[in-house]
Amino acid sequence: MPHDHPARVDLLQGTLDLLVLQTLDALGPLHGFGIARRIEQASGQAVLLNQGTIYASLVRLQQRGWISAEWGTSDNNRRAKYYALTKTGQKQLEKEANDWRRVTAVIGRVLANPHGGSGQ
């Protein structure tokens, strides 16, 4: 039976926070539901987030001072908490994104050379 969506991806520990920071950096202030939907869209539906997962990340990021929150009105006229990246969060995003790129490059090199050696 064909699938409309790619296989679901289980996020590695800590990667959701990176995705939330990146989403807020790219799109500006958003409410939790909007952040979750944007991550799902950007991942091609490979990452599906429930409310508990996204809000746990938002609380954690707010406690660390990487995002701020304030109440506002959503598109459908409901009260919603909007989250925004702080200057500290911007610095953390840059650090985590660089760390992620370094780790994935190393893993890529190892996977590209399954027989060991220098690859030369």
Model feature map: region roles:
Residues 15, 19, 80, 84, ...:
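Amphipathic alpha-helical recognition patches that constitute DNA-binding helices
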Residues 62-79, 84:
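Beta-hairpin "wing" of winged helix-turn-helix
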